[in-house]
Every structure is written in structure tokens, then in C-alpha cells.
């Protein structure tokens, strides 16, 4: 009888131990599962619409590829044109998440911090995230000539004399295009009356059109950005100084909307060393 009771007690203790081990193992397994690292969910697909000055076409297309490789959920869609036309499109309601202008004038027109300044923001627009605004790049205004330089043009001061004498045909940007506005400042510097030399001027809707006229030899010379001269393989014979036309600054800003974070991330990328290397390769410099 005692042997039977001893055996029964031993079996009971063994069963309890087995349940305890099972419970402990289950608990340990549950804890391990809860603490196991989980894969971060992929970002939601985003189409980022960027309006940028035409002079940025080549560099921005290269940077788009680089950025999308590291951000596969983001598709960058560009609209390149003159800054004046881009501003008009934005004012008319076109979708735009990030704007990069070839001059402060177009950015100022959307900046709420300048409301009250009738010259800079005449319509009192509040379209950009003011804190996001940065001076991104600087360019140079240059005098370029077609292959062979048939008129032997070498300097801006020489151009001014030839133009006043009606001896050259010059391609410039329209007055609503930043490169055209810089050109008019150069005219003012040399005392050139645009109306008086109108028959010796041809115009482009953006800087790419001006560069094309020079490349095709349709004109004797043209005034374009250094970066566009580089991209078109044109010869630069002179560069305008800040005294002649001011600094050529490219401001950038995020527009108000539902993609501000994505736009800010892309803008931050454009300020990295990797992006600046691309910009500098065609003649831009950090502002």
C-alpha cells in the first residue's frame, strides 16, 4: 500500500512538472514572438510634382533617377518652363508640390511673408510654406556665340557697341523670363534702348529657346545662363558681373498642400553633397 501511494505521488509530481515546463515554454515562446523585429511597412506611393526653371532640365532629370533609386515609393514628375510661365500656371491652380525658380521675383509673388509689399507680392498670395524657402543655387549670365563665332564677338561691351550700330543679331529671353529680365539689366548698364534696337533682337519663351537659336546659327550671339551654354555645347565669350545684372539666385520652396513632407524631403536631398556635385558639373554653384 505504501509503495502504491509513493508511486501515485511521484506520478502526480511529474505531471505537474511537465505542465509547468510546457507553460513556461509557451510563455517564453510568446515573449520571443512579441519581441521579434518586424519589417517596416513600405511607404505609400507618392507622385511628387516639381515645377522647375527650364535651365535645370538636365541636372534635375539626373537627380530624379538618383532619388527614386533610394525612394522607390516616390515618383518625381517635372514641369520645366520659364519661371514666369510656371508662376502663372501655379496661380491658375496647377498641381505643384515644389517650385524652383530662376529668380527671386517669381517666388516672392507667392510668399506670404511679403504680403503688404505691392512690388514683390502684388496679389497678396500665400501659396508656399514660408519656412521651407531656401536660396538653392547660383548661376551666371553669359554671352555665347555659334560655332566659328562669325562676327568675332568677345565681350559684352563690344556687343553693346555692335548692337547700337545695328551690326549684330542678338537672341534674348522674353521680358517675363528671368534670363530676359537679367538681359534688360545688362542693357540698362550699357545704355541700350531695347526699343531702338528691336529689329536686331530675337526672343525666346525660355532660355532653352534662346540657346537653340544660337546653336542653329540663326543669330550672331545670345545671352543665356552658363549652365545652358554648357548643356548645349556653346562657346561662352563673356560672363556678366553682379554689377551688370545682379546675382542669379535660384530659390526653392515647398507649396502648401497634402504632400508637404514628401516635397520637403526631396528639397533636402537637392541640398546634399551628392546633388550639389551634379549641379556644379554643369556650372551651378551653391547659393
Each PLM stretch: what is its role?
Residues 87, 93-123, 129-134:
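Short beta-strand-centered segments that line the small-molecule binding cleft or hinge
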